[in-house]
Each structure stands twice: as structure tokens, then as C-alpha cells.
């Protein structure tokens, strides 16, 4: 029976994992799709480098188009990263009638819609399960398992680096900079951690999730982003005192025809399932009108978890090839994109304020909120050590719009009794959904 022949772009951590799974699981793959899988060509940087996997020398090449233009290659698997140049490689592969599997979240967040259209036009499949949450099969779940439902909300911990940092800050009461260095030493954070800690990595993944979950062409620029680098020990301490856990949460929510997508530090009730996701693990919480609340949990990165998702996509492509139904791996968007304005986005808010500790300060602050019709769910007022003339007020509001909350912050900063608004965070998950 004719083998399916794979061309692999990249033989790093994930690429080596892909080769290992294909080599070690031949019997399983044969049983799944009824034909063997062979690795025909592999792009590498250095032909002489010692590798963790055993491949014949004639399979290796340093020229990308040796893989893409090889007439014997049926499926191109891309694990080299990059955006602009890599996009062209995949477009050329699709135009050469080769199916594509990619783990590239950066590429799919920016050019996903274009690549899906290119695949359909050429009668080819493109799969990208590994681009979001590594070993968690969340994209296929949205596209297939929950395809009959209407998804109204997704909340995700989709960046392992920031979850590791926040877990350590909470459990060990360690400052941000100290935990970041530990994460770098352990290999969880890059030497330049900006993409992770400022929320950009998570934003790319949320754009992909929202695109599939809401069937709209959601782009990276549609995602509002705030990272974790400004979170302080005091923020962590006060949130715990009020019964919340700080997480970097990607939020995608639909109300009627409008959606919002954001990534930001968020306070969740301690009893919320996402609050129990620790260290480098990922999880995605999904709410559907029919299914209700579901959550998907697992490793968000790493060689073998990510490679497992890549090879699972390869199996999906192979099955489609055997059945003659390629070119329809993903359905196009059903709806026109319609993003919420700040006046449409409602949430509870947490804020810490340093104020003058004098008669009338609190009433002046509460009047700012009451003018906007915003009430309080929780309030703390405490002295500030070493500053007898000041007090700290911590407030959790009831639901208010982003537009009203922005005006409230401006009016608070204009008050003579307010020394500084120290921090603000969104609060989610009271009642879970």
C-alpha cells in the first residue's frame, strides 16, 4: 500500500519529537490510516550536527525548496517558526498541491485566514492544532466536537511562562523579577521574555481560538493586550485576601453579534477551575449554549506534547487523503467581524488606591462611582506602613462598562484626596461563566 511521504521543515525540539513519534508509532499510524508514513525530506541548518533522532543523510537538506518542490512529498510539516518568509513557503507548498501541518501560532494569528483560503483554493488541507496550547486538542474540539453548539465564551491560560511566574509569585510570595530570572534559568522563559510576559504570545493564540470559536476573521490587532510585568507583591496579596487568584487570562466573549477578545491579568475566584492550573500547564475553559461549561487541560508546550498534536494533524490529513476529501479541513467564517466598543464590554473591576487618610476622603471616592451608577461588591481600607498620612483602599466593583470605568479612573486621578491609583485588574468567573 502506497506510503504517505512527509517533508519536514525544521529538526529542532519539536521537529525531533515529530520524527520520533513517526518512527516509534508506525504500527499505530498504519492501523489508523491503513498505510505507512515515511519521512522523505527534512530541512536542517547544519548537515553535520549530531541529532537525537536517526535519519539517513540523503534525507537531510539545507535548502527549503528541496522539500517544497520534491514531487514525492505529499505533506509538508512546518516547525521552523517565523512569519513573512515562512508564509511564502507554505503558500508555495499549497500551490504545489501539498498538504500542510504547522505549529506556528505567530503565522496563523497574522495570516491564518489567508492560508486557509489558499488551501481551499488548491484543494489541500492545512491543520494547525499545535499552534495553540501545545498538547491540548482544543482547535479540533472547537471545529468538530463542539461544531453543533454556539460558543459564547472562552477563557484560557495559554502561556506557560506567565503561568509559571504567577504561580511562583503566589505560592512563594516572591517578587516578579526574581521569579522571571528563575524561569529563564529553568528554560521556561526566553532571554528576551517580552513576547511572553507582555501577553503577545497569548494574544496570538486567542486570535486563533476566537476565529474558530466564533467563526469570524479575528486578527491579532483585534486583541487587547496587557502583560504581567507590572504586577506587584501587594496586588497578589490583596487579591488573595479577597478570595481571588491572579492569572494571565485570554478572554473571548460573544454577546449577540458582537465579540471582544483580550489578554490581561485577571482575578478569578479561588474556587474557579482555572485557578487550580499551576506552573507551566495550560487550560482553556469553554462555554457553549448547549453543552454548558467545559474545560480542557494539559501541557502547553514541550517537544513531545507539541509533536503529538502535530502528528495528530498529520493523521487527519492522511485520513482525508485516503477518503479523497481534502481541501475542506476548515469551514470559512460564517459571520462578519463585529468587535465590541468599550461601552459594550462589561466586567467587574479590582482597583487599589492610595488616598489621604482624612475625614471625607472615602465619601469623595464613592461619589465618583455613584455618579456612574457603579456599586461595590467588596471593600478594604487599611493603613499604609510608614505613611501615617495615607490609607490604602481596595475595591471590587460590580459589573461596569470599560467606558464608564475609564471615566471613573480619570475622575479619581483628578481628586485632590487621591495620591495614586496603584493598579486595576479585571475580575472574572464569579458564577464561572
UniProtKB/Swiss-Prot annotation:
Cofactor note: A sodium ion is seen in the structure; a metal ion may subtly affect the relative position of the nucleotide-binding region to influence enzyme activity, and could increase the stability of the enzyme.
Binding positions (L-homoserine): 190, 201
A GO molecular-function annotation: NAD+ binding
Cofactor(s) this protein requires: a metal cation
Main location class: cytoplasm
Binding positions for NADP(+) per the UniProt entry: 14, 45, 105, 187, 190, 302
pH dependence: Optimum pH is 9 for the reverse direction.
Binding site for NADPH: 13-14, 45, 105, 302
Places the protein is found: Cytoplasm; Secreted
UniProtKB keywords: Amino-acid biosynthesis, Cytoplasm, Metal-binding, Methionine biosynthesis, NAD, NADP, Oxidoreductase, Secreted, Sodium, Threonine biosynthesis
Regulation: Feedback inhibition by threonine. Activated by sodium ions.
Binding, NAD(+): 14, 33, 302
Pathway assignment: Amino-acid biosynthesis; L-methionine biosynthesis via de novo pathway; L-homoserine from L-aspartate: step 3/3; Amino-acid biosynthesis; L-threonine biosynthesis; L-threonine from L-aspartate: step 3/5
Pfam families from the UniProt entry: ACT, Homoserine_dh, NAD_binding_3
Keyword flag DNA repair: no
Binding positions (Na(+)): 129, 132, 134, 136
Listed CDD domains: ACT_HSDH-Hom (cd04881)
Gene3D superfamilies registered for this protein in UniProt: 3.30.70.260, Dihydrodipicolinate Reductase, domain 2, NAD(P)-binding Rossmann-like Domain
Limits of the ACT domain: 350-426
Family: Belongs to the homoserine dehydrogenase family.
Function: Catalyzes the conversion of L-aspartate-beta-semialdehyde (L-Asa) to L-homoserine (L-Hse), the third step in the biosynthesis of threonine and methionine from aspartate. Utilizes NADPH but not NADH as coenzyme.
Assembly and binders: Homotetramer.
PANTHER family reported for this sequence: HOMOSERINE DEHYDROGENASE
Protein name as it appears in the record: Homoserine dehydrogenase
Gene: hom
Amino acid at each position: 500500500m502506497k506510503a504517505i511521504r512527509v517533508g519536514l521543515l525544521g529538526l529542532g525540539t519539536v521537529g525531533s519529537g515529530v520524527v520520533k513519534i513517526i518512527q516509534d508509532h508506525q504500527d499505530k499510524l498504519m492501523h489508523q490510516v491503513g498505510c505507512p508514513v515515511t519521512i522523505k525530506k527534512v530541512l536542517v541548518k547544519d548537515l553535520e550536527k549530531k541529532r537525537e533522532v536517526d535519519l539517513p543523510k540523503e534525507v537531510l537538506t539545507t535548502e527549503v525548496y528541496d522539500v517544497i518542490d520534491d514531487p514525492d512529498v505529499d505533506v509538508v510539516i512546518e516547525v521552523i517558526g517565523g512569519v513573512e518568509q515562512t508564509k511564502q513557503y507554505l503558500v508555495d507548498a499549497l500551490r504545489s498541491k501539498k498538504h500542510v501541518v504547522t505549529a506556528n501560532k505567530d503565522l496563523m494569528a497574522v495570516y491564518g485566514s489567508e492560508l486557509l483560503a489558499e488551501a481551499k483554493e488548491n484543494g489541500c488541507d492545512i491543520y494547525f492544532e499545535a499552534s495553540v496550547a501545545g498538547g491540548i486538542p482544543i482547535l479540533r474540539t472547537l471545529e468538530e466536537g463542539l461544531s453543533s453548539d454556539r460558543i459564547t465564551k472562552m477563557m484560557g491560560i495559554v502561556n506557560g511562562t506567565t503561568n509559571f511566574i504567577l504561580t511562583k509569585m503566589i505560592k512563594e510570595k516572591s517578587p516578579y523579577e526574581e521569579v522571571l530570572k528563575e524561569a529563564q534559568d529553568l528554560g521556561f522563559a526566553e532571554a528576551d521574555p517580552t513576547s511572553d510576559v507582555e501577553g503577545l504570545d497569548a494574544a496570538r493564540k486567542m486570535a486563533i481560538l476566537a476565529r474558530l470559536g466564533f467563526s469570524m476573521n479575528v486578527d491579532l490587532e483585534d486583541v487587547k493586550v496587557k502583560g504581567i510585568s507590572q504586577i506587584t507583591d501587594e496586588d497578589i496579596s490583596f487579591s488573595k485576601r479577597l478570595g481571588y487568584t491572579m492569572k494571565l487570562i485570554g478572554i473571548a466573549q460573544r454577546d449577540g453579534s458582537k465579540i471582544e477578545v483580550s489578554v490581561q491579568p485577571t482575578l478569578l475566584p479561588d474556587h474557579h477551575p482555572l485557578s487550580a492550573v499551576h506552573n507551566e500547564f495550560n487550560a482553556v475553559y469553554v462555554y457553549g449554549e448547549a453543552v454548558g461549561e467545559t474545560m480542557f487541560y494539559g501541557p502547553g508546550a514541550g517537544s513531545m506534547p507539541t509533536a503529538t498534536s502535530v502528528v495528530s494533524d498529520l493523521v487527519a490529513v492522511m485520513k482525508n487523503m485516503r477518503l479523497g476529501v481534502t481541501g475542506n479541513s476548515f469551514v470559512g467564517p460564517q459571520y462578519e467581524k463585529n468587535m465590541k466598543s468599550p461601552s459594550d464590554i462589561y466586567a467587574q473591576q479590582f482597583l487599589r488606591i492610595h488616598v489621604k487618610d482624612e475625614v471625607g476622603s472615602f465619601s469623595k471616592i464613592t461619589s465618583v462611582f455613584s455618579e456612574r451608577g457603579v456599586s461595590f461588591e467588596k471593600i478594604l481600607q487599611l493603613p499604609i506602613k510608614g505613611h501615617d498620612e495615607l490609607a490604602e483602599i481596595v475595591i471590587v466593583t460590580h459589573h461596569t462598562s470599560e467606558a464608564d470605568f475609564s471615566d471613573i479612573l480619570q475622575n479619581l486621578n483628578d481628586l485632590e484626596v487621591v495620591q495614586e491609583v496603584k493598579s486595576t485588574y479585571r475580575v472574572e468567573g464569579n458564577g464561572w461563566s
